[in-house]
């Protein structure tokens, strides 16, 4: 088995997305959160766009949602009910699952077993005003603001073998629900959507939705050099760990000369560096120079290096299973280059391991 770092006091969460419970360690996005909230307040709608791995989901879950829950004023006061879902390949069904989970539309927080079917029937019958009907007939109507988060809308376009948006009416209905609901400005229903930059232009083909996109778009850029300095200040410097100017210069060059987002790379890099530095602090050596950086490796290569180290740490059986696991994702379909899925059952059969191990 691979060694695990001591994460007890580590403010970095590696390659994971930030969640609501990580809000206290979600640094350097405070101004962007307030800027995005001003759009929500004026439009009741926010479209977050950005490059792949720029941190859109983290921005929503650890930035916007905690701030909204903490007394952000809407039409119905400062109390909110929030549902958050990905459209996947069944956008309407997934919306109804989100609506019927966790009692979001009840004061008591207890939903009924019939809610999913009831909501699905209402939307299928009422079409674009289905959400309005559901909200008007629920317990939180006029008592709480209702926020619907549709994260990673690119799901609708990235898996053509499973969901063909040119043939299906469901994504049209989803966007009709959004645009029609927003016309009822006094209800207190709000929307946040996120989509990668490469697919954002597809939204312009939905007439009613396209009319509100230009005033509601928020571009989330990857972390820049000033963001990195702010993160370092609130984490490393707070523990009296200082960085050599040469190291900072290297970071500056890296983020300015790299086209793709390095957010995940820096998250993993800082997590490993923080563990090393805390260990060194016990030896009165809280200083980060090039020598210490070399212990971890280059930021832009750290994910591949970490995977190689993990592979090396496995026994022969583990290595064979990991090789089979990655082989199961080999894709010869030109339509799915860039985004590819594989069914769990296929992976299980190909690797020949049980559910618990997988």
Regions found by a protein language model. Give the residues of each.
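Amphipathic helix/helix-loop-helix segment enriched in hydrophobic residues with interspersed Lys/Arg
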Residues: 1-358
